């Protein structure tokens, strides 16, 4: 059963395209995991970061860190841990920042074909600049929404709902690009369809994406519209486990 239907034929404009950042614009999940692992080591924790990220990727860093402790950690302390992790991540990723193959051509084609384009991410301002401005990608986005712009992160729908509102597009006329299960669930809760980008997970890990891609070399905006016409229904979000 679906909770809404995407039907571009009912609109004079093509659907808006909303992108997550980490793992979608750039393939940085292994570096993110390495930064978490170094932080956990410094904190004397034995948690394995990569499996943790596969389960919780999409959440703000502070929320991910809280999950490794059995007791609540004061927000000020979590923020400090998140800043340490951010420093490690930037140091590790400094000379490795590259856009996902085909991304720029896809964004150019989407803009040329009249799609509004937004970015909805769990990252904050400095981290956004670290990727968007270094790679000169900000020019392609009409709207950018980060963790400081919404009260709740993914899997809550706030990030994508806010992005759609700022774009001036109804949720049912938005398609989200996500690499994380929690992000996919956020899209469905917002009433949107989702394209899964398999930089860090396998296609089978996602619930019901419109399609799955390894990068943007195998997809065009026109092909996306054809898929949408064949699969217009938005899946019901799965209930969270654990």
Specify the residue positions occupied by each region the protein language model found.
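Residue-level detector of anion-binding/catalytic polar loops
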Residues: 46, 116, 193
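Residue-level signature of catalytic and energy-coupling elements of molecular machines
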Residues: 36, 121, 156
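Asp-based, Mg2+/Mn2+-dependent phosphohydrolase catalytic module
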Residues: 2-3, 7-15, 108-111, 124-125, ...
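Short, flexible loop segments at the rims of nucleotide/cofactor-binding pockets, characterized by
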Residues: 93-97, 122, 189-191
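N-terminal helical cap/lid subdomain that shapes the substrate entry/recognition surface
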Residues: 12-104, 109, 113
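Conserved G/P- and acidic residue-centered "switch" motifs that form tight phosphate/ATP-binding loops
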Residues: 20, 24, 121, 179
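Hydrophobic beta-strand core positions in alpha/beta domains
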Residues: 118-119, 196
């Amino acid at each position: 059963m679906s909770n809404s239907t995407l039907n571009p034929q009912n609109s004079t404009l093509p659907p808006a395209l909303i992108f997550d950042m980490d793992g979608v614009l750039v393939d940085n999940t292994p570096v993110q995991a390495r930064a978490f692992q170094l932080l956990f080591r410094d904190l004397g924790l034995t948690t394995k970061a990569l499996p943790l990220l596969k389960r919780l990727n999409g959440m703000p860093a502070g929320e991910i860190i809280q999950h490794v402790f059995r007791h609540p950690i004061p927000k000020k302390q979590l923020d400090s841990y998140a800043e340490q992790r951010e420093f490690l991540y930037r140091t590790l990723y400094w000379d490795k920042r590259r856009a996902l193959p085909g991304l720029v051509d896809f964004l150019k084609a989407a803009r040329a074909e009249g799609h509004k384009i937004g970015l909805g991410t769990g990252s904050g301002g400095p981290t956004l600049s670290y990727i968007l401005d270094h790679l000169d990608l900000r020019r392609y986005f009409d709207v950018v929404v980060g963790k400081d712009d919404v009260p709740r992160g993914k899997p809550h729908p706030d990030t994508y709902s806010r992005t759609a509102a700022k774009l001036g597009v109804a949720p049912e006329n938005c398609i989200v690009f996500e690499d994380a299960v929690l992000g996919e669930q956020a899209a469905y809760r917002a009433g949107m369809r989702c394209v899964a980008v398999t930089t860090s997970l396998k296609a089978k890990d996602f619930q019901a994406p419109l399609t799955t891609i390894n990068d943007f070399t195998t997809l065009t905006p026109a092909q996306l519209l054809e898929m949408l016409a064949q699969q217009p229904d938005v899946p019901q979000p799965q209930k969270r486990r654990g």
